[in-house]
Every structure is written in C-alpha cells, then in structure tokens.
Amino acid sequence: MVLLAIVGVIVYAVMVWPVNPTRMKPAESYEQLRDTVEKKTDIRVPGEDLLPWTVTERQLRMDGPSRLAKVSGFALSGTMERGGVAFSAEVSVGVTGVVGDLPSPWDVYRHVPVYLFRNQGFYMAQLYIDGSEYIIQLHYPENVTLPEEDAAYVEDALQAACHNIIDLNEG
C-alpha cells in the first residue's frame, strides 16, 4: 500500500512538474500550429502572409506549465522592414476577457472594434472575437522617428491584418 502511494505521488509530480514554464511550446511548422490550434480550440489561425514579414518562430500557447496543459492559443513571431527600419513583429491570440477600459476604437470592421495603441518604438492592434483576444505587435528602435509615409504604411499593414483576422473568423 505504501509503495502504491509512493508511485502515485511520483506519477502526480511528473505530470504537474512544469515542462513549459513560459506556457509556450514550439511548433514544428505553420501547418502543425494551425492544425493543432484549430482542432483543440475555437481559435482560427491566420496565414503567415498576414503581414509583410518573415516568420521566424511559431509557438503554441498553453493554459499552464504542466504536461497536462491544453492548447489555448498561439504566437507567430518574425521581422519586417520599412524605410530601412527593422521591426520585430508578433501575432498572438489567447482566450481572455476584456480587462480595464479600452480607448475609442481605431477601426470598426464587420461590427468588430479594433483598438490601436502606439508609442515611440511600438504599435499594437488589439481585437476580440468570440472570447479570444488577437494582438498584433510591432516594435522598432525607440530612437527612430518614423517618417509619415512609413508610419502610414505600418498602420495600413496593421489594419489589413486585422481585417484579414476578422474575415477569417466570419467565414
């Protein structure tokens, strides 16, 4: 009986021991990421051509750090360039609720409000569809001031990406 209890404790410890402390798990390919996320959640994964970028990393978001954790979203990371400025970019989604007050929408497409946050070195578009929070972030060096034309290009790319995500979920 004692041996059974010891084995039970060991099995439990192995199952709940953190294997993904960041709650992110690498995906081998875009296809594996899309298939896994769409099979195990209600989240739709946009194509890698969502932004004018090069995707460098694909990750599954997990709902916890243990072996028993379930897929709860994804993150695609990459780089893009405009006007000689290098941007790091990330598209991610997870199940969440709206927290705090949001500003007035930057855009409303198909009745879905899109919020834009920007600061020196940073752009973030955020939208909520069926309980999932989609976030697109672009970071660039804070000491760089984007010319108006490049800033408009970035905002147009963000808006097109948000519309693409909304269309994907409406279809």
Per-segment meaning from a language model:
Residues 11, 36-37, 160:
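Compositionally biased, low-complexity segments enriched in small residues
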Residues 13-24:
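Hydrophobic single-pass membrane-insertion segments
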Residues 100-171:
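A short, solvent-exposed beta-edge/loop patch
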